[in-house]
Regions:
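Bacterial N-terminal signal peptides
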Residues: 2-11
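Divalent metal-dependent phosphoesterase catalytic cores across multiple superfamilies
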Residues: 18-185
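N-terminal Sec signal peptide cleavage junction
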Residues: 13-16
């Protein structure tokens, strides 16, 4: 019975209702277009690391060509690795590249380009080939809709080997609808 009700509600949800939910949340920042989900990196090894982003097209496209670049400097004066990744709606327009030919224990900068626009610049680091110590930051549940999380900026300024996020970041409910009114938070 519950499954039938859920399917009925989803089938009868109109585009107007879906647009309203997006407008209420207000999470789109025009300056990030079409990279609204930002950039991320992970799974570092001594000579490679995975970089990730998602492109959000204004309309459904059969495929999107996404250029990516990796550099040792923020200004990308010298590109040490680059390529093109073809994404599509079956992948939800996500991009996941396993960048290789990197040096151990080095900081790298990366960015993406699609639909005539560039993403923000990401920073990543490969694992050292001789680990005598490891500097890790651990962060936990963060509700993007409920705060600014300035502490993340401080973490970005630290000389860390890794940041591990142990919780959720985006929750599935309307903005300002988390508390039940008792706590008023």
């Amino acid at each position: 019975v519950y499954l039938f009700c859920a399917i009925f509600i989803l089938i009868n949800c109109t585009n107007k209702e879906l647009t309203f939910i997006e407008d209420v949340d207000g999470l789109k920042v025009d300056s990030m277009d079409p990279f609204y989900h930002g950039v991320a990196s992970g799974d570092p090894l001594e000579n490679k690391v995975i970089i990730w982003t998602r492109v959000t097209p204004e309309k459904t496209l059969s495929e999107i060509s996404v250029k990516w670049k990796m550099s040792e400097s923020k200004d990308f004066n010298e590109i040490i690795n680059e390529g093109v990744f073809i994404t599509n709606s079956k992948r939800d327009y996500t991009v996941k590249v396993d960048v290789d030919k990197l040096s151990p224990g080095k900081i790298y900068f990366y960015k993406f380009e699609a639909l005539g626009k560039e993403s923000m610049v990401g920073r990543t680091k490969t694992i050292s080939d001789s680990i005598s110590s490891l500097k890790i930051a651990a962060i936990s549940c963060s509700d993007y809709q409920r705060g600014f999380f300035n502490a993340y900026g401080s973490l970005a300024d630290e000389d860390l080997d890794a940041v591990i996020h142990l919780g959720d970041y985006i929750y599935e409910y309307k903005s300002r609808d988390y508390s039940n009114g008792i706590f008023k938070r």
